[in-house]
Protein backbone atom coordinates (compact mmCIF):
# COMPACT_ATOMS: atom_id res chain seq x y z
CA UNK A 1 0.00 0.00 0.00
CA UNK A 2 1.30 3.40 -1.01
CA UNK A 3 1.04 6.47 1.25
CA UNK A 4 0.64 10.08 0.14
CA UNK A 5 -0.66 13.37 1.45
CA UNK A 6 -2.74 14.10 -1.66
CA UNK A 7 -4.12 11.96 -4.50
CA UNK A 8 -5.22 13.85 -7.61
CA UNK A 9 -7.50 12.05 -10.05
CA UNK A 10 -6.79 13.61 -13.45
CA UNK A 11 -3.46 14.62 -14.97
CA UNK A 12 -4.78 17.35 -17.23
CA UNK A 13 -4.09 21.07 -17.53
CA UNK A 14 -5.47 21.72 -14.02
CA UNK A 15 -4.47 18.56 -12.14
CA UNK A 16 -0.81 18.80 -13.17
CA UNK A 17 -0.22 22.41 -12.01
CA UNK A 18 -2.01 21.60 -8.76
CA UNK A 19 0.27 18.60 -8.24
CA UNK A 20 3.38 20.68 -8.94
CA UNK A 21 2.30 23.40 -6.51
CA UNK A 22 1.58 20.91 -3.73
CA UNK A 23 4.80 18.97 -4.29
CA UNK A 24 6.91 22.13 -4.39
CA UNK A 25 5.33 23.04 -1.04
CA UNK A 26 6.49 19.74 0.44
CA UNK A 27 3.32 17.62 0.26
CA UNK A 28 3.72 14.10 -1.12
CA UNK A 29 1.38 13.98 -4.10
CA UNK A 30 0.27 11.23 -6.48
CA UNK A 31 -1.46 12.06 -9.78
CA UNK A 32 -3.55 9.32 -11.39
CA UNK A 33 -4.50 9.63 -15.05
CA UNK A 34 -6.42 7.30 -17.34
CA UNK A 35 -4.39 8.14 -20.47
CA UNK A 36 -1.12 6.35 -21.26
CA UNK A 37 1.93 8.59 -20.98
CA UNK A 38 2.65 8.19 -24.71
CA UNK A 39 -0.80 9.60 -25.53
CA UNK A 40 -0.43 12.48 -23.09
CA UNK A 41 2.96 13.43 -24.53
CA UNK A 42 2.03 13.02 -28.21
CA UNK A 43 3.86 15.93 -29.90
CA UNK A 44 1.54 16.00 -32.93
CA UNK A 45 -0.46 19.20 -33.36
CA UNK A 46 -4.13 18.50 -32.69
CA UNK A 47 -5.52 22.00 -33.24
CA UNK A 48 -6.46 22.76 -29.63
CA UNK A 49 -5.20 25.88 -27.89
CA UNK A 50 -5.83 27.71 -24.62
CA UNK A 51 -5.93 31.39 -23.71
CA UNK A 52 -3.79 32.03 -20.62
CA UNK A 53 -4.58 35.21 -18.69
CA UNK A 54 -1.57 37.06 -17.32
CA UNK A 55 -2.41 35.97 -13.75
CA UNK A 56 -2.23 32.36 -14.98
CA UNK A 57 1.12 33.11 -16.62
CA UNK A 58 2.43 34.38 -13.27
CA UNK A 59 1.33 31.12 -11.65
CA UNK A 60 3.07 29.01 -14.28
CA UNK A 61 6.21 31.13 -13.91
CA UNK A 62 6.35 30.44 -10.16
CA UNK A 63 5.96 26.71 -10.86
CA UNK A 64 8.90 26.86 -13.28
CA UNK A 65 6.76 26.01 -16.30
CA UNK A 66 6.53 29.34 -18.11
CA UNK A 67 10.17 29.41 -19.23
CA UNK A 68 9.46 26.18 -21.12
CA UNK A 69 6.24 27.58 -22.61
CA UNK A 70 7.28 31.11 -23.52
CA UNK A 71 8.90 30.20 -26.88
CA UNK A 72 5.58 28.63 -27.97
CA UNK A 73 3.30 31.39 -26.66
CA UNK A 74 1.73 34.16 -28.73
CA UNK A 75 1.07 37.35 -26.72
CA UNK A 76 -2.32 39.01 -27.13
CA UNK A 77 -1.58 42.73 -27.45
CA UNK A 78 -5.08 43.86 -28.41
CA UNK A 79 -8.65 42.53 -28.51
CA UNK A 80 -11.31 43.85 -30.89
CA UNK A 81 -14.97 42.99 -30.18
CA UNK A 82 -17.59 43.57 -32.89
CA UNK A 83 -21.20 42.67 -33.61
CA UNK A 84 -22.75 41.84 -36.95
CA UNK A 85 -23.84 39.17 -39.41
CA UNK A 86 -21.88 36.79 -41.63
CA UNK A 87 -20.99 38.33 -44.99
CA UNK A 88 -21.94 41.87 -43.90
CA UNK A 89 -19.92 44.77 -42.45
CA UNK A 90 -19.74 44.81 -38.65
CA UNK A 91 -21.56 47.41 -36.58
CA UNK A 92 -19.85 50.81 -36.40
CA UNK A 93 -19.89 50.48 -32.59
CA UNK A 94 -17.19 48.18 -31.28
CA UNK A 95 -14.99 47.60 -28.25
CA UNK A 96 -11.19 47.80 -28.36
CA UNK A 97 -8.82 46.62 -25.62
CA UNK A 98 -5.11 47.52 -25.72
CA UNK A 99 -2.65 46.02 -23.23
CA UNK A 100 -0.64 49.25 -23.09
CA UNK A 101 -3.62 50.96 -21.44
CA UNK A 102 -3.20 48.80 -18.32
CA UNK A 103 0.59 49.07 -18.32
CA UNK A 104 1.22 45.61 -19.75
CA UNK A 105 2.77 44.24 -22.91
CA UNK A 106 -0.01 41.66 -23.25
CA UNK A 107 -3.53 40.80 -22.12
CA UNK A 108 -2.67 37.11 -22.09
CA UNK A 109 -1.13 34.45 -24.32
CA UNK A 110 -2.40 31.81 -26.72
CA UNK A 111 -0.60 28.47 -26.36
CA UNK A 112 -1.22 25.10 -27.99
CA UNK A 113 -2.42 22.57 -25.43
CA UNK A 114 0.24 20.05 -26.51
CA UNK A 115 2.98 22.50 -25.48
CA UNK A 116 1.32 23.12 -22.10
CA UNK A 117 1.09 19.38 -21.47
CA UNK A 118 4.70 18.73 -22.48
CA UNK A 119 6.03 21.58 -20.34
CA UNK A 120 4.07 20.39 -17.31
CA UNK A 121 5.29 16.83 -17.75
CA UNK A 122 8.87 17.99 -18.15
CA UNK A 123 8.61 19.70 -14.75
CA UNK A 124 6.86 16.67 -13.28
CA UNK A 125 9.67 14.35 -14.38
CA UNK A 126 12.21 16.17 -12.23
CA UNK A 127 9.95 17.03 -9.29
CA UNK A 128 10.39 15.71 -5.78
CA UNK A 129 7.32 14.59 -3.78
CA UNK A 130 5.37 14.03 -7.01
CA UNK A 131 4.53 10.81 -8.85
CA UNK A 132 2.36 10.02 -11.88
CA UNK A 133 0.49 6.73 -12.11
CA UNK A 134 -0.75 6.16 -15.68
CA UNK A 135 -2.67 4.59 -17.27
CA UNK A 136 -4.95 4.08 -14.29
CA UNK A 137 -8.11 5.49 -12.76
CA UNK A 138 -9.71 5.64 -9.35
CA UNK A 139 -11.91 2.55 -9.01
CA UNK A 140 -13.21 3.29 -5.52
CA UNK A 141 -12.78 5.81 -2.74
CA UNK A 142 -13.37 4.99 0.93
CA UNK A 143 -13.58 7.99 3.26
CA UNK A 144 -13.06 7.87 7.02
CA UNK A 145 -12.51 10.49 9.70
CA UNK A 146 -8.80 9.70 9.64
CA UNK A 147 -8.08 9.42 5.91
CA UNK A 148 -9.02 8.35 2.40
CA UNK A 149 -8.33 4.93 0.90
CA UNK A 150 -8.04 5.12 -2.88
CA UNK A 151 -8.20 1.91 -4.93
CA UNK A 152 -7.04 2.14 -8.54
CA UNK A 153 -8.10 0.13 -11.56
CA UNK A 154 -4.70 -1.60 -11.48
CA UNK A 155 -5.67 -2.78 -7.94
CA UNK A 156 -3.05 -0.59 -6.31
CA UNK A 157 -4.18 1.17 -3.11
CA UNK A 158 -3.12 4.56 -1.80
CA UNK A 159 -3.88 6.17 1.55
CA UNK A 160 -4.06 9.96 1.65
CA UNK A 161 -5.42 12.86 3.67
CA UNK A 162 -7.20 14.36 0.66
CA UNK A 163 -8.38 13.17 -2.75
CA UNK A 164 -8.88 15.78 -5.47
CA UNK A 165 -11.22 15.24 -8.42
CA UNK A 166 -9.78 16.96 -11.49
CA UNK A 167 -11.13 14.27 -13.78
CA UNK A 168 -13.39 15.96 -16.34
CA UNK A 169 -16.89 17.39 -16.61
CA UNK A 170 -18.36 13.93 -16.07
CA UNK A 171 -16.20 13.36 -13.02
CA UNK A 172 -16.46 9.74 -11.79
CA UNK A 173 -15.22 10.81 -8.35
CA UNK A 174 -17.88 13.50 -8.10
CA UNK A 175 -20.51 10.90 -8.96
CA UNK A 176 -19.11 8.41 -6.43
CA UNK A 177 -19.35 11.10 -3.75
CA UNK A 178 -22.99 11.77 -4.63
CA UNK A 179 -22.35 15.43 -5.43
CA UNK A 180 -25.03 16.73 -7.77
CA UNK A 181 -24.71 19.39 -10.45
CA UNK A 182 -26.85 22.16 -11.87
CA UNK A 183 -26.53 21.86 -15.64
CA UNK A 184 -28.05 22.67 -18.99
CA UNK A 185 -27.13 22.40 -22.65
CA UNK A 186 -26.94 25.24 -25.16
CA UNK A 187 -28.46 24.78 -28.64
CA UNK A 188 -24.98 25.38 -30.02
CA UNK A 189 -21.92 23.47 -31.19
CA UNK A 190 -18.35 24.71 -30.81
CA UNK A 191 -16.19 24.27 -33.92
CA UNK A 192 -12.42 24.58 -33.45
CA UNK A 193 -9.97 24.87 -36.33
CA UNK A 194 -6.60 26.40 -37.15
CA UNK A 195 -6.39 28.99 -39.90
CA UNK A 196 -3.42 30.20 -41.93
CA UNK A 197 -3.63 33.76 -43.30
CA UNK A 198 -1.66 35.97 -45.67
CA UNK A 199 -1.12 38.96 -43.39
CA UNK A 200 0.36 39.02 -39.87
CA UNK A 201 -2.14 39.24 -37.02
CA UNK A 202 0.16 41.47 -34.92
CA UNK A 203 -1.06 39.83 -31.75
CA UNK A 204 -4.66 41.03 -32.17
CA UNK A 205 -7.53 38.76 -31.09
CA UNK A 206 -10.98 39.25 -32.59
CA UNK A 207 -14.39 38.32 -31.25
CA UNK A 208 -17.24 38.74 -33.73
CA UNK A 209 -20.71 38.29 -32.27
CA UNK A 210 -22.91 36.65 -34.89
CA UNK A 211 -26.58 35.60 -34.55
CA UNK A 212 -25.59 31.95 -34.08
CA UNK A 213 -22.97 32.75 -31.43
CA UNK A 214 -19.48 34.20 -31.00
CA UNK A 215 -16.83 33.74 -33.68
CA UNK A 216 -13.40 34.15 -32.06
CA UNK A 217 -10.08 34.49 -33.89
CA UNK A 218 -7.16 33.93 -31.53
CA UNK A 219 -3.60 34.73 -32.68
CA UNK A 220 -1.10 31.87 -32.65
CA UNK A 221 2.63 31.86 -33.34
CA UNK A 222 3.42 32.51 -37.00
CA UNK A 223 0.79 33.63 -39.48
CA UNK A 224 -1.80 31.36 -37.91
CA UNK A 225 -4.88 31.85 -35.76
CA UNK A 226 -7.10 29.51 -33.81
CA UNK A 227 -10.75 29.69 -34.68
CA UNK A 228 -13.45 29.09 -32.07
CA UNK A 229 -16.70 29.12 -34.03
CA UNK A 230 -20.00 28.81 -32.19
CA UNK A 231 -22.77 27.60 -34.50
CA UNK A 232 -26.40 26.54 -34.09
CA UNK A 233 -26.78 22.80 -33.55
CA UNK A 234 -28.98 22.48 -36.62
CA UNK A 235 -26.35 23.99 -38.94
CA UNK A 236 -23.12 22.63 -37.47
CA UNK A 237 -23.18 19.09 -38.96
CA UNK A 238 -23.48 20.43 -42.51
CA UNK A 239 -20.57 22.84 -41.94
CA UNK A 240 -18.38 20.14 -40.44
CA UNK A 241 -19.12 17.86 -43.38
CA UNK A 242 -18.04 20.36 -46.03
CA UNK A 243 -15.03 19.64 -48.21
CA UNK A 244 -12.06 21.94 -47.65
CA UNK A 245 -12.86 24.46 -50.42
CA UNK A 246 -16.47 24.97 -49.31
CA UNK A 247 -15.49 25.12 -45.63
CA UNK A 248 -12.94 27.84 -46.41
CA UNK A 249 -15.60 29.81 -48.29
CA UNK A 250 -17.92 29.69 -45.27
CA UNK A 251 -14.98 30.62 -43.11
CA UNK A 252 -14.17 33.67 -45.24
CA UNK A 253 -17.78 34.94 -45.00
CA UNK A 254 -17.39 35.17 -41.22
CA UNK A 255 -13.66 35.85 -40.96
CA UNK A 256 -13.52 38.92 -43.20
CA UNK A 257 -10.56 40.09 -45.26
CA UNK A 258 -8.46 41.96 -42.68
CA UNK A 259 -5.85 39.16 -42.65
CA UNK A 260 -5.93 38.50 -46.39
CA UNK A 261 -6.74 35.08 -47.81
CA UNK A 262 -7.38 32.40 -45.22
CA UNK A 263 -7.54 28.63 -45.21
CA UNK A 264 -8.23 25.99 -42.61
CA UNK A 265 -5.33 23.64 -41.83
CA UNK A 266 -5.17 20.54 -39.69
CA UNK A 267 -8.07 18.79 -37.99
CA UNK A 268 -11.42 20.36 -37.15
CA UNK A 269 -12.92 19.70 -33.74
CA UNK A 270 -16.48 20.05 -32.57
CA UNK A 271 -18.14 19.68 -29.20
CA UNK A 272 -21.59 20.41 -27.75
CA UNK A 273 -21.73 23.49 -25.52
CA UNK A 274 -23.11 23.16 -22.02
CA UNK A 275 -23.00 24.60 -18.52
CA UNK A 276 -22.60 22.82 -15.20
CA UNK A 277 -21.83 23.80 -11.62
CA UNK A 278 -21.36 21.32 -8.79
CA UNK A 279 -23.75 21.86 -5.88
CA UNK A 280 -20.81 21.38 -3.52
CA UNK A 281 -17.09 21.75 -4.17
CA UNK A 282 -15.96 19.69 -1.16
CA UNK A 283 -16.86 16.75 1.04
CA UNK A 284 -14.83 15.30 3.88
CA UNK A 285 -11.40 14.45 2.35
CA UNK A 286 -12.56 15.29 -1.18
CA UNK A 287 -12.26 18.49 -3.22
CA UNK A 288 -13.44 19.22 -6.77
CA UNK A 289 -11.18 21.25 -9.04
CA UNK A 290 -11.48 22.56 -12.61
CA UNK A 291 -14.00 20.88 -14.91
CA UNK A 292 -15.09 18.53 -12.14
CA UNK A 293 -16.47 21.58 -10.30
CA UNK A 294 -17.70 23.74 -13.18
CA UNK A 295 -18.01 24.10 -16.93
CA UNK A 296 -18.88 27.38 -18.64
CA UNK A 297 -19.64 28.69 -22.13
CA UNK A 298 -16.39 29.43 -24.05
CA UNK A 299 -17.56 32.92 -25.05
CA UNK A 300 -14.89 34.61 -22.90
CA UNK A 301 -12.14 32.00 -23.25
CA UNK A 302 -11.84 31.74 -19.46
CA UNK A 303 -12.38 28.02 -18.82
CA UNK A 304 -8.75 27.05 -18.18
CA UNK A 305 -8.02 30.24 -16.24
CA UNK A 306 -10.93 29.48 -13.93
CA UNK A 307 -9.56 25.99 -13.33
CA UNK A 308 -6.05 27.30 -12.67
CA UNK A 309 -7.48 29.70 -10.06
CA UNK A 310 -9.08 26.66 -8.42
CA UNK A 311 -5.72 24.89 -8.39
CA UNK A 312 -3.89 27.92 -6.99
CA UNK A 313 -6.48 28.45 -4.24
CA UNK A 314 -6.65 24.77 -3.26
CA UNK A 315 -2.84 24.51 -3.12
CA UNK A 316 -2.71 27.57 -0.87
CA UNK A 317 -5.42 26.24 1.46
CA UNK A 318 -3.77 22.82 1.80
CA UNK A 319 -0.24 24.18 2.24
CA UNK A 320 -1.42 26.71 4.84
CA UNK A 321 -3.13 23.88 6.74
CA UNK A 322 0.03 21.76 6.57
CA UNK A 323 2.16 24.61 7.95
CA UNK A 324 -0.25 24.99 10.87
CA UNK A 325 -0.31 21.24 11.54
CA UNK A 326 -4.01 20.93 10.73
CA UNK A 327 -5.79 17.96 9.17
CA UNK A 328 -5.61 18.58 5.41
CA UNK A 329 -8.80 16.68 4.68
CA UNK A 330 -10.95 18.01 7.52
CA UNK A 331 -14.18 19.57 6.31
CA UNK A 332 -13.45 22.95 7.89
CA UNK A 333 -10.09 23.04 6.04
CA UNK A 334 -11.66 22.24 2.67
CA UNK A 335 -14.63 24.56 3.24
CA UNK A 336 -12.20 27.48 3.13
CA UNK A 337 -11.42 26.49 -0.47
CA UNK A 338 -15.11 26.18 -1.33
CA UNK A 339 -15.97 29.60 0.12
CA UNK A 340 -13.07 31.16 -1.75
CA UNK A 341 -13.81 29.69 -5.15
CA UNK A 342 -17.56 29.28 -5.34
CA UNK A 343 -18.49 32.93 -5.83
CA UNK A 344 -15.87 33.48 -8.56
CA UNK A 345 -17.05 30.38 -10.43
CA UNK A 346 -20.71 31.32 -10.07
CA UNK A 347 -20.06 34.90 -11.21
CA UNK A 348 -18.07 33.75 -14.25
CA UNK A 349 -20.73 31.17 -15.13
CA UNK A 350 -23.51 33.75 -14.87
CA UNK A 351 -21.66 36.37 -16.91
CA UNK A 352 -20.71 33.99 -19.74
CA UNK A 353 -24.23 32.58 -19.84
CA UNK A 354 -25.73 36.08 -19.93
CA UNK A 355 -23.35 37.28 -22.64
CA UNK A 356 -24.13 34.28 -24.81
CA UNK A 357 -27.88 34.79 -24.46
CA UNK A 358 -27.57 38.52 -25.15
CA UNK A 359 -25.36 38.22 -28.24
CA UNK A 360 -26.51 34.91 -29.78
CA UNK A 361 -29.71 36.19 -31.34
CA UNK A 362 -30.93 38.42 -34.13
CA UNK A 363 -33.62 40.43 -32.33
CA UNK A 364 -33.28 44.00 -33.64
CA UNK A 365 -33.92 45.91 -30.35
CA UNK A 366 -31.46 43.68 -28.49
CA UNK A 367 -28.90 44.03 -31.26
CA UNK A 368 -29.14 47.83 -31.01
CA UNK A 369 -28.89 47.68 -27.22
CA UNK A 370 -25.79 45.47 -27.19
CA UNK A 371 -24.08 47.57 -29.89
CA UNK A 372 -24.74 50.65 -27.76
CA UNK A 373 -23.29 48.82 -24.76
CA UNK A 374 -20.09 47.95 -26.65
CA UNK A 375 -19.74 51.57 -27.75
CA UNK A 376 -20.31 52.93 -24.23
CA UNK A 377 -17.73 50.64 -22.62
CA UNK A 378 -15.26 51.56 -25.36
CA UNK A 379 -15.83 55.26 -24.66
CA UNK A 380 -15.42 55.02 -20.86
CA UNK A 381 -11.78 54.46 -19.92
CA UNK A 382 -12.30 53.15 -16.35
CA UNK A 383 -14.88 50.62 -17.58
CA UNK A 384 -12.59 49.52 -20.39
CA UNK A 385 -9.66 49.06 -17.99
CA UNK A 386 -11.84 47.15 -15.51
CA UNK A 387 -12.83 44.62 -18.18
CA UNK A 388 -9.20 44.25 -19.26
CA UNK A 389 -8.08 43.55 -15.69
CA UNK A 390 -10.94 41.09 -15.33
CA UNK A 391 -9.95 39.27 -18.53
CA UNK A 392 -6.39 39.11 -17.22
CA UNK A 393 -7.55 37.45 -14.01
CA UNK A 394 -6.37 40.36 -11.87
CA UNK A 395 -9.51 41.03 -9.82
CA UNK A 396 -10.89 39.66 -6.58
CA UNK A 397 -8.97 37.82 -3.88
CA UNK A 398 -6.10 36.26 -5.80
CA UNK A 399 -4.20 33.21 -4.55
CA UNK A 400 -0.50 33.84 -3.94
CA UNK A 401 0.48 31.86 -7.04
CA UNK A 402 -1.63 34.17 -9.20
CA UNK A 403 0.28 37.13 -7.74
CA UNK A 404 3.58 35.57 -8.72
CA UNK A 405 4.40 34.34 -5.19
CA UNK A 406 5.06 30.82 -3.92
CA UNK A 407 1.99 29.10 -2.50
Feature map (PLM): residue ranges:
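Glycine-rich FAD pyrophosphate-binding loop
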Residues: 23-45
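Conserved FAD/dinucleotide-binding core of flavoprotein oxidoreductases
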Residues: 100-102, 210-272
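FAD-binding beta-loop-beta segment adjacent to the flavin cofactor pocket
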Residues: 272-288, 346-347
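N-terminal FAD cofactor-binding segment of flavoenzymes
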Residues: 44-86
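C-terminal helical "tail/cap" subdomain of flavin- and related membrane-associated enzymes
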Residues: 316-407
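Central beta-strand plus flanking loop segment that forms part of the substrate or channel wall
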Residues: 170-205, 223-225, 231-235, 251-252
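N-terminal Rossmann-like FAD-binding beta1-loop-alpha1 element of flavoenzymes
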Residues: 4-31
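Conserved N-terminal helical subregion
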Residues: 72-176, 184-189, 398
Amino acid sequence: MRQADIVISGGGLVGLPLGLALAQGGLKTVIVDVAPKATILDPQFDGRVSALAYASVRMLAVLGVWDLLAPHAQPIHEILVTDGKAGRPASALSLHFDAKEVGSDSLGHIVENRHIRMALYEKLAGAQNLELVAPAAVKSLAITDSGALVTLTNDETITAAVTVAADSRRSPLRSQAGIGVVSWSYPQIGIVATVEHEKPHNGVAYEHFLPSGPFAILPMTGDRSSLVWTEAQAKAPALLGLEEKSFNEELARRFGSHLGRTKSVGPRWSYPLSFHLAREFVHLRLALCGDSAHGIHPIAGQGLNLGLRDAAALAEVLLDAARLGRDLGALDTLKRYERWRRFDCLAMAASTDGLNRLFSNDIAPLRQLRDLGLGLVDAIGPARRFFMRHAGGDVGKLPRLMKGQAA
